[in-house]
């Protein structure tokens, strides 16, 4: 006979699962997992966002350097820029504010300082719009939003915000999913470009995952005039990548 479980300590009550905070509805949680998945057909795997040229020119040649470089990019380009756009665009889509959506999309385009970085956000935005069109076939209201997105032309942060807008997810959860999806793609790029083993990649991903909540919190408190995309060395690296002799990635 199995031993009886130990009794709860005197003066304490066993936790009641029914009283625990309720999480996301299953459908919304699965949608966020789907959006963060590297299997989402938007082509994120084909971009390194400057990491490939950093391996050649900026000393990113081992696990420690790759982890530090990616963590800097998380804080410099994602937390201060793209994640803040996702946060603000999510609110705009849910409010039906088309002018605000357009302004945020234009801001993303203006912050891409090289042709390959601009092509990346445009290509991934178009691909996500195509995916949304297929997902919402037969839903006139959703397709109307997708048509507005496709007409911009869309950037990836604004398209991601629309993809999440029709879920019941909180803004924080949407940004966590977006950031983790970015981290997974970048770790896979590091594994190929440095190169690194799978275990090293998982250690880097663990470091990024630990930093993501702070990056999301920072992005969510930024106002309209506080977003920024000041990362001049990334622009220099990206420009050099355009003429790099041998490349695996498109950025």
UniProtKB/Swiss-Prot annotation:
Organism domain of life: Bacteria
Cysteines paired by S-S bonds: none
Cellular localization per UniProt: Cytoplasm
Keywords: Chaperone, Cytoplasm, Nickel insertion
Keyword Disulfide bond attached: no
Segments of skewed composition (Low complexity): 9-20
Disordered, as annotated region: 1-20
One Pfam family in the UniProt entry: UreF
InterPro entries linked to this entry: UreF, UreF_sf
The UniProt record lists the keyword Repeat: no
One GO cellular component, as annotated: cytoplasm
Annotated GO MF terms: nickel cation binding
Oligomer status and interactors: UreD, UreF and UreG form a complex that acts as a GTP-hydrolysis-dependent molecular chaperone, activating the urease apoprotein by helping to assemble the nickel containing metallocenter of UreC. The UreE protein probably delivers the nickel.
Protein family per UniProt: Belongs to the UreF family.
Function: Required for maturation of urease via the functional incorporation of the urease nickel metallocenter.
PANTHER family, A to Z: UREASE ACCESSORY PROTEIN F
Protein name per the record: Urease accessory protein UreF
Organism: Paracidovorax citrulli (strain AAC00-1)
């Amino acid at each position: 006979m199995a031993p009886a479980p130990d009794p709860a300590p005197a003066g304490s009550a066993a936790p009641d699962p029914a009283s625990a905070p309720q999480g996301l509805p299953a459908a919304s949680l699965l949608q966020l997992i789907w959006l963060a998945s590297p299997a989402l057909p938007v082509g994120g795997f084909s971009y390194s966002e400057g990491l490939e040229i950093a391996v050649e020119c900026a000393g990113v040649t081992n696990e420690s350097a790759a982890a530090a470089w990616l963590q800097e990019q998380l804080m410099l380009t994602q937390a201060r820029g793209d994640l803040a756009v996702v946060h603000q665009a999510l609110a705009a889509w849910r409010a039906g504010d088309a002018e605000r959506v357009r302004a945020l999309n234009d801001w993303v385009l203006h912050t891409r300082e090289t042709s390959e970085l601009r092509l990346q956000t445009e290509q991934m935005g178009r691909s996500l719009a195509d995916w949304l069109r297929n997902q919402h076939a037969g839903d006139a209201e959703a397709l109307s939003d997708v048509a507005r997105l496709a007409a911009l032309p869309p950037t990836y942060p604004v398209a991601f915000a629309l993809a999440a807008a029709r879920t019941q997810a909180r803004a924080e959860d949407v940004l966590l999913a977006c950031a983790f999806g970015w981290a997974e793609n970048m770790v896979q790029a590091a594994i190929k470009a440095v190169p690194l083993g799978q275990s090293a990649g998982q250690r880097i991903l663990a470091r990024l995952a630990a930093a993501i909540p702070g990056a999301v919190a920072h992005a969510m408190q930024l106002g309209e005039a506080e977003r920024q995309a000041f990362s001049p060395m990334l622009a220099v690296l990206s420009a050099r990548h355009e003429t790099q002799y041998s490349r695996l990635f498109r950025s």
